[in-house]
Amino acid sequence: MAATGVLAEIIDGDVYKYYADGEWKKSTSGKSVAIINPTTRKPQYKVQACSQEEVNKVMDSAKSAQKSWAKTPLWKRAELLHKAAAILKEHKAAIAECLVKEIAKPAKDAVTEVVRSGDLVSYCAEEGVRILGEGKFLVSDSFPGNERTKYCLTSKIPLGVILAIPPFNYPVNLAVSKIAPALIAGNSIVLKPPTQGAVAALHMVHCFHLAGFPKGLISCVTGKGSEIGDFLTMHPGVNCISFTGGDTGIAISKKSGMIPLQMELGGKDACIVLEDADLDLVAANIIKGGFSYSGQRCTAVKVVLVMESVADALVEKVKVKVAKLSVGPPEDDSDITPVVSESSANFIEGLVNDAKEKGATFCQEYKREGNLIWPLLLDNVRPDMRIAWEEPFGPVLPVIRINSVEEGIHHCNASNFGLQGCVFTKDINKAIMISDAMESGTVQINSAPARGPDHFPFQGIKDSGIGSQGITNSINMMTKVKTTVINLPSPSYTMG
């Protein structure tokens, strides 16, 4: 499908180009990678299959461009980011169309992702000027045994080349959440988008290109993970990796060497429901948290842990709401759309079959057509079922009945994941106690898990990640402290 208008330069025939040195290029490999439309299950787009040699050239350009960019005034960096944000919003329709066709994101949600991304870039520009515009001044005599003979000046300087690897489910938003902090902090960026979502990411990168960033500062390489995946993450030219995705991140962390890592690797986000909870509120949040974008969100509700005494009432309320969810193509803004791939659908079906064999109660009939899976609530799930522990990344939600708060906390903490969780109760003291006890990076009280607003800290523990995201944390993570010490010939005291 050919691009039109100002975006036409990024495509050659039916294959989208990759971006390097401020230009859109065809790969010398002569190969391409097909992107399958999850709804039609037919090829929708093609992108370049970049070679390792092309990655080497990108890294050289990124290193060179970063040296000049680090000398660019903060206000100028921010100015260009604001410009990119505005262009991103101008092209929201074209980018959203790609999201609909590449990852089956409902049309309205696709537009929202692009607009949200523009807002993130602008906020990052403003926050970066504040954070990076301030340093620290220390004097030596504040430590015992020292006279005031040393002045210490500290500042934050860029790391160098940042490798950004976003996931398929938010290929634009979770790309700019890495790109914008890196750029405002004075780094260069090499983006490796997911295959599903690569064209949307290329359109997004084109907006940064139109904003006028220096050549080589931003690169976007596409291709097969088997060819350039490890080559990128182990490349000696990379000074930091920001990765969002699955357990591939664990392998990356073992291979990447001594560089800073920012990792978000998924979760099994638990929803603990106490006896005094507002069940209407809980049911609404279970629907929003568990089934939005067909459950393909790291922060989706992945398991409901509800007190036995209110379980029947809650399950009935959720069943009523599940029945009202629309199912169909993303172009129709359906609530439930196809999952991203056939392999994903097969994995989800495997979890469902395991639960069926082991006696879970099906609140709806299991139904699947191609990659489209109808929303399913599974009651009376037990810990011996795979769905109790594994992340389905689909519209299937298990309910585990518990007899005590401690039982719910134990199940939550027994997971190898620790991204987010939530607790519903009218007792704020109990809520805080449970939040403290849950081994999760974030705990929401009386609301479903969520990433955002984008300036909030966002982090996982255990196998859910390394480090913390959010605009401020990402800017800080993509810098290092530089210290300059002025040595005085004799002690100097103010008004001395």
From Swiss-Prot:
Substrate binds at R116, N169, Y170, R297, C298, T299, R451. It catalyses: D-glyceraldehyde 3-phosphate + NADP(+) + H2O = (2R)-3-phosphoglycerate + NADPH + 2 H(+). It comes from the Eukaryota. The record marks N169 as: Transition state stabilizer. NADP(+) binds at K192, T195, D230, E391. It is found in: Cytoplasm. NAD(+) binds at G245, G246, D247, T248, G249. InterPro entries: Ald_DH/histidinol_DH, Ald_DH_C, Ald_DH_CS_CYS, Ald_DH_CS_GLU, Ald_DH_N, Aldehyde_DH_dom, ALDH-related_metabolic_enz. The active site is at E264, C298. GO terms for cellular component: cytoplasm. Its main location: cytoplasm. Important as a means of generating NADPH for biosynthetic reactions. Belongs to the aldehyde dehydrogenase family. This is NADP-dependent glyceraldehyde-3-phosphate dehydrogenase. It comes from Pisum sativum (Garden pea). The lineage of its organism: Eukaryota, Viridiplantae, Streptophyta, Embryophyta, Tracheophyta.
